Amino acid sequence: MDNIIFFFFKFYLYYIFLYFLGRSFLILISKLSKIKIDSFAKIQGLEIQIFYPVVGIFFLGNYLYLLNYLVPLSHPAAYFSLLFLIVNIYEPLNRAATKNVIINLPFYVIILISSFDINFHYDAGLYHLNNQLWIRESNIVFGLSNIYGPFGVGSIYEYISSFLWVDKTFMLIHFTNIIFVGLLFSFIFINLTRNKNQQLYTGSFLLLLYSIFDNFGLTGGRNGFINIQSIGKQDLPIAVLFLVTSILLLTSIFRNRYKEEEFLLYSILALFIFQLKISGVVISFFYILFLYYYKTEKNITIFKLLSKIKFLIILSLFWLTKSLLQTGCVIFPLESSCITNLSWVNSDYLLNIENVTVNFSNSYYFGESLKIWIETYLEVPTNQTILFNYIISLLTLYIISKIFFINYKNIKKHKILFIIFSASCLFYLRFGPDMRYLSGLMMLGVYSIGINHYPRKNIPIFLVKILLLSSLIMVPKLDSYKSFSLSNVPRVLLPEEKMIERHGRLAPSSGDRCWVNINCSANFENYNIDNSGYFKIVTLKK
């Protein structure tokens, strides 16, 4: 079947699968942790149902990476994840809340238009697709990063994406990103229309305005709001998850109200962010602060608190072990976290990758001239454009907040925000102030303007809906609308790369992209793959 109706049907079928998979996982972990988190639970006034699809993605990714310890993901066992859907029969649906989720589904019709002008990201051909191919063709490979350095920063997204190769058009990978866009707009919409927790209202309204401002400004726009990327990148999911999770954590702290079901969901989302990308570790600043206030308010020890999420801690340990086996480092490519006496570890190789990674992101070395670094950073046109538009957006939204909203000052909240933003900015300054990584923090900065602000007069829901619809329409690029067709179904095709022989294997004849070829690597180093044991071991040749 190859028509537009089936295309939309395929997306909604995928959405429903993730929805009920996420629900299954929460039912299971509720039993394991003895924390009640049923279909009637609310997270800061938000129905738990809006988080089901994202939790489903988290569950699918963790099932797949654990399975990959034993077998390649082309193995039929990868599809056993479908069996977990049976768990749904053990708990009745909250029909009212499910109905509210269905109301939000039309959001995706607009967002799906982005599929008509989508293609592979440069990094997809560089390492993502070949990494996924290795995951599909082999169980966990010791020293995988020796084949090609970027394989070492493998995200949980690689495992999810490799599973989605079942769709030969690669659209399911794009659909996964779209689900995160839907989460963001559902989060904003619910906060502005039916959430009784008014602390989330003003910040959400400012985020909505900010999303519209993204389409105007220097060089036509872009101010740090989410941008639908080409297939193969996971920066958008990280930005959305970071924003939503940090807002929820801060809201719990500021309200001084702590519930076990919220603690459990926050823990899931925080772990997911870290698994998506190592730079997501910044969420730990918010999470640790939340844990401190939670244990203080409930008067329990940190060990008793963490015992409630033993299963998630075990998942974390297996994830770090995976990194250690594939790279020799707990946190790749941080050379100081590597175990150098492992047979597949080469210290010089790791140090070189660490330096390349930090320098590629225009990182700042403390002690060097900040003035020179800023000048160099702003020489990149994208950095200059986004930063300028972001500052203008912030100033405009600040003025709007002063005119149309009342500010109830709270010194404690301001101190917490100052400390946590300072720590986050210093981290990104040192380890990668790339605009792609900063999007979540930039959106949180916009939201923070609205903290402790309440409308002077009620904002008509009709106006909110008009603004939301306008913002949604602007999410797909203009070229996507131009490419939209009722007769052509979106698909992307793998390009063919010319190869040369290097060290007895294949390498790109020009450039550095292998696309999908397990015998290809752009690595100039020579390596050896030992296939004699149950696990393949890759070592660099001297």
PLM segments and residue spans:
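Membrane-embedded, hydrophobic transmembrane alpha-helices
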Residues: 1-97
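Hydrophobic, aromatic-rich transmembrane alpha-helices
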Residues: 20, 24, 180-196, 371-411
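Membrane-interface alpha helices of multi-pass inner-membrane proteins
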Residues: 64-68, 262-289, 328, 424-428
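Perimembrane helix-loop-helix junctions
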Residues: 86-96, 283-313
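Active-site lumenal/periplasmic loops and adjacent helix-entry segments of GT-C-fold
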Residues: 113-205, 210, 226-229
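Membrane-lumen/periplasm interface segments of specific transmembrane helices
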Residues: 116-119, 160, 306-383
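Signature aromatic-anchored transmembrane alpha helix within multi-pass, membrane-resident enzymes
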Residues: 259-270, 288-289, 308-313, 418, ...
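Intrinsically disordered, polar/acidic, low-complexity terminal segments
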Residues: 336-366, 371, 459-542
